[in-house]
Design a protein with these regions (language model features):
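N-terminal assembly/interaction segments in proteins that build large macromolecular machines
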Residues: 2-244
Length: 244
């Protein structure tokens, strides 16, 4: 036998196949893990590989802050159906991914997959493949954002929207920051503003909005006499404070 028990375990984590199937495939492949994977696929045994080709269009957004309150993350993980997106095992996996982002600080999704999952000896990728096999649907970690500083997290609609707000503060009590942060986060969840304030709006975006608003006003005879003041008011309404 020119392979080890670890090779069998790695192949099982990669494909979701049983131990005996993995051992047989490695024996046939003379210890080559990639070739063994292909053998399992050809035999129709690599369940997680097959499921990984299916579209993951549903899922959840999850936001959390570290115990010290100085590191926050918002992450999106997708599944195939809304039913699985509400599954306890799926949600636990999403939370584990978020914790791993906080404590391991991966640069991107690829680095997150390679990292050891928080509180586990498995990598995130191995845990992902295990969940695909157990739950029976394709699962994809789509994206995440990690901030360092005074952060407040908010999740709306059971995971339909996740918001993470970072503040620049000095000696603000935690309860005050959390209360204010939740109010701001709820506004962001409701309005989905694109910019923090007027100074952060690109000139081309502002010009485009002016064109749209002017066209709307000109198409409304009632507003034709108050074009300039009204357009300025409408533009101000489009730029509500945000941090997303």
């Amino acid at each position: 036998m020119n392979f080890t028990a670890k090779d069998v375990a790695d192949l099982r984590a990669k494909t979701g196949c049983g131990m005996m199937d993995c051992k047989k495939a490695l024996t046939e492949a003379e210890g080559d893990v990639e070739k063994a994977t292909e053998i399992l696929r050809e035999k129709g045994l690599a369940a997680s590989v097959k499921k990984a080709s299916r579209i993951a269009a549903e899922g959840v957004a999850y936001a959390m802050v570290s115990e010290c309150g100085k590191v926050g993350v918002v992450i999106e993980v997708n599944a195939e159906t809304d039913f699985v997106a509400k599954n306890a095992q799926f949600i636990d996996f999403v939370k584990t991914c978020a914790e791993t982002v906080i404590y391991e600080n991966p640069a991107d999704v690829e680095a997150l997959l390679a990292a050891k999952a928080h509180g586990s000896d498995m990598t995130v990728d191995a845990m992902l493949k295990d969940k695909i096999l157990t739950i029976g649907e394709n699962i994809k970690i789509r994206r995440f954002v990690r901030y360092e500083g005074d952060c407040v997290a908010y999740v709306h609609g059971g995971g339909r929207i996740g918001v993470l707000v970072r503040f620049e503060t000095e000696n603000v009590p935690a309860e005050v920051l959390n209360e204010c942060g939740k109010d701001v986060a709820m506004q962001i969840a409701a309005l989905n503003p694109a910019y923090l304030d007027k100074s952060t709006v690109p000139a081309e975006a502002l010009d485009k909005e002016k064109e749209i608003l002017m066209a709307q006003i000109q198409n409304d005879p009632k507003e034709s006499q108050a074009t300039s003041p009204l357009s300025s008011t409408l533009l101000r309404k489009q730029r509500r404070p945000a941090a997303r």
